[in-house]
A protein has these predicted regions:
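Short alpha-helix-to-loop micro-motif enriched in aromatics/charged/Gly
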Residues: 66-71
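Short loop/turn microsegments at loop-to-beta-strand junctions
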Residues: 30, 48-49
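Cyclic-nucleotide recognition modules
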Residues: 74-123
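Cyclic nucleotide-binding regulatory module and flanking cytosolic helices
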Residues: 1-37, 81, 86-87
Length: 123
C-alpha cells in the first residue's frame, strides 16, 4: 500500500456544503492510498482512523460466513465513501475491504472530519 499526499478525488463531492476554507483544512489532513488488486484497505477488527473515498478503481467489502467463506456485502465505486459508520459509531470494522482492481483511495483523517463537523454542523 503506497501513500502519497493529496490526490485526484474531489472533496467537494463528499462535502458539497463546505466552504473552501473547510475543504482546504480537510485536504491538508488527507492523503491518497494506492492499492493493488487484492490488497486490503482495512481488515475486520481494525480500529478506524480515517474515512475513505474511492477516487479510481473499485473495492469490495466482505464478511466471513459461518462456513468460512467470503461474502461480498458491498461494492464501493469511484465517488463513494466507506468507513463513516465505524468512525462515528466509534467501533471496529466488522468487515474487510479488498481492492477488486488497482485503486486510489482518498484517506481523510477521522479527527479532522469530527473537528469540521463541530465547526460546521450543517455538513
Amino acid at each position: 500500500m503506497e501513500k502519497k499526499q493529496k490526490g485526484t478525488f474531489t472533496l467537494r463531492r463528499l462535502f458539497p456544503a463546505l466552504h473552501e476554507e473547510e475543504l482546504v483544512r480537510i485536504q491538508d489532513s488527507s492523503s491518497v492510498i494506492r492499492l493493488r488488486k487484492g490488497q486490503n484497505l482495512f481488515i475486520s477488527g481494525d480500529s478506524p482512523r480515517s474515512i475513505y473515498g474511492v477516487a479510481n478503481g473499485c473495492l469490495k467489502i466482505v464478511r466471513e460466513s459461518t462456513e468460512g467463506e467470503s461474502v461480498i456485502t458491498r461494492v464501493v465505486r469511484p465517488g463513494n465513501i466507506v468507513g463513516i459508520r465505524e468512525v462515528f459509531g466509534e467501533f471496529k470494522y466488522s468487515r474487510t475491504s479488498v481492492a477488486l482492481k488497482d485503486s486510489e483511495v482518498f484517506s481523510i483523517d477521522a479527527q479532522a472530519v469530527m473537528d469540521m463537523i463541530s465547526r460546521s454542523p450543517a455538513v
